[in-house]
Amino acid sequence: MSAKAISEQTGKELLYKYICTTSAIQNRFKYARVTPDTDWAHLLQDHPWLLSQSLVVKPDQLIKRRGKLGLVGVNLSLDGVKSWLKPRLGHEATVGKAKGFLKNFLIEPFVPHSQAEEFYVCIYATREGDYVLFHHEGGVDVGDVDAKAQKLLVGVDEKLNTEDIKRHLLVHAPEDKKEVLASFISGLFNFYEDLYFTYLEINPLVVTKDGVYILDLAAKVDATADYICKVKWGDIEFPPPFGREAYPEEAYIADLDAKSGASLKLTLLNPKGRIWTMVAGGGASVVYSDTICDLGGVNELANYGEYSGAPSEQQTYDYAKTILSLMTREKHPEGKILIIGGSIANFTNVAATFKGIVRAIRDYQGPLKEHEVTIFVRRGGPNYQEGLRVMGEVGKTTGIPIHVFGTETHMTAIVGMALGHRPIPNQPPTAAHTANFLLNASGSTSTPAPSRTASFSESRADEVAPAKKAKPAMPQGKSATLFSRHTKAIVWGMQTRAVQGMLDFDYVCSRDEPSVAAMVYPFTGDHKQKFYWGHKEILIPVFKNMADAMKKHPEVDVLINFASLRSAYDSTMETMNYAQIRTIAIIAEGIPEALTRKLIKKADQKGVTIIGPATVGGIKPGCFKIGNTGGMLDNILASKLYRPGSVAYVSRSGGMSNELNNIISRTTDGVYEGVAIGGDRYPGSTFMDHVLRYQDTPGVKMIVVLGEIGGTEEYKICRGIKEGRLTKPVVCWCIGTCATMFSSEVQFGHAGACANQASETAVAKNQALKEAGVFVPRSFDELGEIIQSVYEDLVAKGAIVPAQEVPPPTVPMDYSWARELGLIRKPASFMTSICDERGQELIYAGMPITEVFKEEMGIGGVLGLLWFQRRLPKYSCQFIEMCLMVTADHGPAVSGAHNTIICARAGKDLVSSLTSGLLTIGDRFGGALDAAAKMFSKAFDSGIIPMEFVNKMKKEGKLIMGIGHRVKSINNPDMRVQILKDFVKQHFPATPLLDYALEVEKITTSKKPNLILNVDGFIGVAFVDMLRNCGSFTREEADEYVDIGALNGIFVLGRSMGFIGHYLDQKRLKQGLYRHPWDDISYVLPEHMSM
């Protein structure tokens, strides 16, 4: 959400820190917070003024009218404060319908003053600007300030000066206080703007001869401005409204939400409740809550929440397990219900999100059965059939009753089923599979005739006169038609999937040319990106600079802005500098409201229509679609969005607009145009902007509006009907009717979905619309029926003549999507069995990386997983690590190190120098480790005794690999071998091959003392013993690892550490190019050549 309430303490702290005014503000930072855990001795140490001044104490928990409720203790000593707090601190209180515990109080100095010194000041944001209210009589009895107070609107980008304040606001203020008040209000307004407040009320503001005192303060800030105000705000806290506790689970989901590009929301209403929801989509989540409350479930509704914006499988798992954990804590005598609902997704892969939920259900199957939980599922969107299949499957395998429905079932029908108001069908009708839409069912390869590109009703627009003649449209700068079959757009952002979706839509609508002319992406140079137009490959240019894109594509008049919330404002402002652009869609959610208002102001000046922010966009069947609107091609075809119908709609929610596509296609001849204006408080274009366009468009015969709690935009529709400006039938339903039934305020998924006054509630708006003559259903459940009855009435009157359906062209399916749907298979070019990086976390041979660290497996354990695909015993891991340590380096003289040093001194980079050293490893250097293992294993396994083996090798004239050392001998042992031998003898369960090799060593050293078992030989034979005897491998597996050269890997990996060390050493010593000295080279030339 956007506007969030902050505590009085936070508001005052920010104000005292950052307000800039000539008025003398008294008692700065003089406040002390008291909670049930407060240590009074410590509090007095921090705030010594508590002992010397008269005090005021009050709860700081977003409670309005505390004075009237007797929740303010005035003019008390410290002991008096303690006595006053005793029956209140930590005790339950009732405020209106809300019950909650009082556990956060504020103590401040008492300010003696007269009633004449109390004033009221309030600043709040609206679409047009910020209203400043002032009343010369403040305090608890201020009454209806809207009616009494002086009011001044400060427009967007305008400044408030002291002269305006005196002239418009301080009309009735005492003359001697006007200067002080004007300076304070001016500073307060600048502070309010700079720190992105949306509401700031001080009542009373006391002005005495000593200065200004801020007694009581209430405030809201725009939480989305955190990235701008972080330095000044610090770690700001947003307390829950009174009557609702702050739960750690809510904080956990809020933290997940903050770290994700997706949206994840959770509000606990009644943790003991029977009905729980897990709904996809900001709009759909409100509709489900409405329906539950309408059907009598308000007291049993446990939570409000939503997930949207394509969360990953892991994020959905984390969200789902949080809800399942909460709902399986307390039993309910009637069992519990979980509603996993959602509208038809535009771009979220339903199967991926459902797999996360399925994982959570499997993890909690025991508690779910114990608590007698029944689950109802309804969803649509990309790959929804697979999602529903896995959901149904988990019900069968776990024994949990799970009822699964798709787009063939009305979105909220499952609520009626869950609450026993409608029967649960045994076999719901199944929708056609994705593939059935995209693959030509007849088998014919010919492209069908072009589909119709105008509704039949549009071609007869002049023949059938409307029932009433509409008043002429007011002259406007903005066009009634935003999109046509020839509309061209630029897409800001590297959104290849959305662009391909637009091109597929264009193709299936039989457009002559693609609707995307170019893309703008500032983070790469100019280039071309490959896309498909039907089965053909085409190139679309990508520009670094917007100016270049505009210059080269003057035919473009639409920009689709996929910039992030941080970049969306600047990129949209830049776009509006180009007169050719008439429509801009802003997809990003979370743009601060103050910045959105600046965009709206500039757009109005330029005559530009903005759709969004926080939207999926809009669609005009047969002509143009914005980004991901309408979902994937299967939904476009199922909802008949490839040709126009007669019904135009406007909604706030992107997901609900897709649901409207589905409802309208099932109950009428289809959609003519649909726009989702976005969920923010100040959408760029309003309901009425689009409703008036539809009124002036001959092809539109009826209008559907899906309104929402918050704002007053829907009342303009009532006014339009009364004034005769709107004459076409309008069907409207405002979602959010459940809000009036909750005891405490709930912020819904959309930033603008919050009623600040009675007229903004969904119930009030639905009533007013009905009285104005709009067709209003009794609930969202009946919306489809009302639309159908209005449509059938228009058909009966002849205003709409349904046209004959023409099949659309067949569009080839993307390979990657066909594979995801399981429609095709192809042999993979590569196979791997050791590592998987595709999920939420890295997996080594089946073990998540978090487990690797939790178990403290170390380098040896990781090698066990990556090299041998299994967990090795601890001593084996330690042995591997010891081998790496002892093989790490053997000085600069050996061939590998020598090569590395020469390369480093020749100025080569790290990788080149390292590889030059590694390339020397072979039979003569390092490779003895592998060869020794094979040679000793063969001898031992053949059953010949050590003496026989030595004699055999001597007779064949072969060296025994792993025996012998240039420097070390039986009298000067190699300490590396000694360390390894001690460890192996102490920890290995058996060492038959090592014992054999040591017997061989006795024979060889009796002939020559330096023919010892060297470090290569020791590691080789000991490693074979480890593989054969640790219990983790079969004999065949152990032999295979020796045969494929796994042991050489130990030397290569270990020695790489030393080679890198030599490289860094040479660079650090700044050694120059190496040239070998002549006196160390013996020049032996052929004699006949030297003559």
Swiss-Prot record:
Residues annotated with Phosphothreonine modification: T447, T629
Low complexity: bias regions: 442-457
Instruction: Extract the ranges annotated as region (Disordered).
Output: 442-478
- CDD domains for the chain: CCL_ACL-C
Tell me what PTMs the record reports for this protein.
Phosphorylated by PKA and GSK3 in a sequential manner; phosphorylation results in activation of its activity. Phosphorylation on Thr-447 and Ser-451 depends on the phosphorylation state of Ser-455. Phosphorylation on Ser-455 is decreased by prior phosphorylation on the other 2 residues. Phosphorylated at Ser-455 by BCKDK and dephosphorylated by protein phosphatase PPM1K.
The effect annotated for K544R is: Abolished ubiquitination by the BCR(KLHL25)complex, leading to imapired differentiation of inducible regulatory T (iTreg) cells
UniProt EC number: 2.3.3.8
Q: Does the keyword Nuclease apply?
A: no
Positions with a binding annotation for CoA: L769, K770, E771, A772, G773, V774, F775, V776, P777, R778, S779
Q: Which InterPro entries match?
A: ATP-citrate_synthase, Cit_synth/succinyl-CoA_lig_AS, Citrate-bd, Citrate_synth-like_lrg_a-sub, Citrate_synth-like_sm_a-sub, Citrate_synth_N, Citrate_synthase, Citrate_synthase_sf
The entry's keywords: Acetylation, ATP-binding, Cytoplasm, Isopeptide bond, Lipid biosynthesis, Lipid metabolism, Magnesium, Metal-binding, Nucleotide-binding, Phosphoprotein, Transferase, Ubl conjugation
Specify the cross-link site (Glycyl lysine isopeptide (Lys-Gly) (interchain with G-Cter in ubiquitin)): K530, K536, K544
Q: How is its activity regulated?
A: Phosphorylation results in activation of its activity. Glucose 6-phosphate, fructose 6-phosphate, fructose 2,6-bisphosphate, ribulose 5-phosphate, and fructose 1,6-bisphosphate also act as activators.
Q: Which residues does ATP bind?
A: K58, R66, G67, P109, V111, E118, D216
Enzyme class name: transferase
| GO cellular component terms listed in the entry, alphabetical order | cytosol; mitochondrion
Where it sits in the cell: the answer is: Cytoplasm, Cytosol
Describe the effect of K536R.
Abolished ubiquitination by the BCR(KLHL25)complex, leading to imapired differentiation of inducible regulatory T (iTreg) cells
Stretches assigned to the ATP-grasp domain: 4-265
Molecular-function GO term, any one: ATP binding
> Could you describe the subunit structure of this protein?
Homotetramer.
Describe the function of this protein: Catalyzes the cleavage of citrate into oxaloacetate and acetyl-CoA, the latter serving as common substrate in multiple biochemical reactions in protein, carbohydrate and lipid metabolism.
Descriptive protein name = ATP-citrate synthase
Q: Tell me the organism.
A: Mus musculus
**What high-level taxonomic lineage is stated for the organism?**
Eukaryota, Metazoa, Chordata, Craniata, Vertebrata
Q: Which gene encodes it?
A: Acly
